[in-house]
Design a protein with these regions (language model features):
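Conserved SAM-binding loop of SAM-dependent methyltransferases across substrates and taxa
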Residues: 2-21
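Conserved SAM-binding motif I beta-strand of class I
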Residues: 24-29
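Conserved SAM/SAH-binding beta-strand->alpha-helix loop
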Residues: 31-33
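Conserved SAM-binding loop
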Residues: 38-39
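A short acidic, Gly/Pro-enriched loop at the edge of an enzyme's catalytic core
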Residues: 59-74
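A short beta-strand submotif of the Rossmann-like class I SAM-dependent methyltransferase core
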Residues: 75-79, 84
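A short glycine-rich, Lys/Arg-flanked "PGG" loop and its adjoining helix->strand segment in the class I
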Residues: 88-111
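Class I S-adenosyl-L-methionine
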Residues: 124-166
């Protein structure tokens, strides 16, 4: 995407963190244009920080980027976008992207890594099922948003769940 979430995170950490540890920030997107845009913003506004953007296709089995390991991974709409395409993937024996997303992301995690997903397309239960099926990920925490009730069902317009890798 445009890197907004990553930029907000690094600004907040720089304001709040008082230790001497340095952090590296990496943003990924499928679109080369999005990566170019976010890289330009990073260069103009955050040149003193370790910020990198890469064009990555998570749905390629041979994606070498997945060899990288991260402590925290944030997804704000990636799974939602992947789920819109219901075409089968040749690399994954005809499975659809939504069904391989979690196992692909898990490759970038070590024990104790956190994956925070924000979705406007899935319910809490649906998201938990998608992410925990066939992975070593389990629910760690969630963000509670204001909810509403419609047709006897209570819900919210957005769901954010943090998963930890065991």
């Amino acid at each position: 995407g445009n890197g907004h979430l990553l930029f907000q995170l690094l600004e907040d950490i720089n304001e709040e963190y008082e230790g001497d540890k340095t952090f590296e920030y990496t943003g990924i997107d499928y679109s080369p244009d999005s990566v170019k845009f976010a890289s330009g913003v990073a260069k103009r506004k955050y040149s003193e920080l370790k910020v990198n953007f890469e064009q990555v296709d998570l749905l390629q089995e041979s994606c070498s980027f997945l060899q990288n390991k991260f402590d925290i991974l944030l997804d704000k709409g990636t799974l939602d976008a992947i789920a819109l395409n219901q075409e089968s993937l040749a690399d994954f024996n005809g499975k659809i992207g939504m069904d391989v997303y979690a196992s692909q992301v898990e490759k970038m995690m070590v024990q104790g890594s956190i994956l925070l997903i924000t979705s406007c397309n899935f319910t809490k239960d649906e998201l938990i099922k998608i992410i925990t099926k066939d992975t070593n990920l389990e629910v760690w925490d969630e963000i509670n948003y204001p909810s509403f009730q419609f047709g006897g069902v209570k819900g919210s317009t957005v769901v954010s769940i943090a998963f930890v890798r065991n």
